[in-house]
Amino acid sequence: MNSSWRVVVFLGLVILCHSRRARACNGGYEMIVHSIENCAGEGQIVTIDPKSTVTLMEDCKVKSKATARTVGFKTAMMDVTITKNGLPVLKETVDICANLEEASGNKEAAEIITMFGVPDHCPVAASEIRTDESQTYSLEKYKQHLLVAQGRSIIDVLVKHDKGESCFKIDMEVTSPNLIG
């Protein structure tokens, strides 16, 4: 999976979370989403219900209960900046529509798109996407990255659409398990 698609998948999972603490796989890592903010104002193209949740279970599976709404769009260029422990670690621009087209040929990406009900192509019609906790996705193959993810991260996402903008600010933290005792 290319790095742009990984960013999209990661943000998709994180954006669905809101103020939840979850014991993660691989010995009890904990993910805490302190806040998610829809920050483009009243005309925001895509919004996420602040009551949406994702639960990271001990068996390295994730399940979600979430609602996202869009007024529809034809284009979506995402600028994402991730700052970890106060230091910038990633700044990338991703053409979401191009990534959706590429994802259709990627079994892993297609599974995530299907699970979360994300449209698989642009243009995207006005819609509401809801997920429930009956579907799960395994993060088993990513658990070795938890040590690298450890610490506080601020994720700033700005998506420029043909009809306006979407903006999300996510404040999250990954803490390590207590290895002593």
UniProtKB/Swiss-Prot annotation:
Q: Where in the cell is it found?
A: Secreted
What's in the GO CC field?
Answer: extracellular region
Tissue expression per record: Salivary gland (at protein level).
Q: What is its main location?
A: secreted
Asked if Cell cycle is a keyword of the record, the answer is no
InterPro entries registered for this protein in UniProt = GM2-AP_sf
Which domain of life, per UniProt?
Eukaryota
The secretion signal range is 1-24
| One GO biological process term | host-mediated perturbation of symbiont process
Q: What induces it?
A: (Microbial infection) Up-regulated in salivary gland following infection with P.berghei sporozoites.
- Tell me which UniProt keywords the record has, alphabetically: Secreted, Signal
Report the function annotation for this chain. Answer: Decreases host neutrophil chemotaxis induced by N-formylmethionine-leucyl-phenylalanine (fMLP).
Please share what else the UniProt entry notes about this protein: Active immunization or antiserum against the protein reduce P.berghei liver burden in mice after exposure to the infected mosquitoes. Individuals in malaria-endemic areas have higher levels of IgG recognizing the protein.
Q: What is this protein called?
A: Sporozoite-associated mosquito saliva protein 1
Q: Which organism is it from?
A: Anopheles gambiae
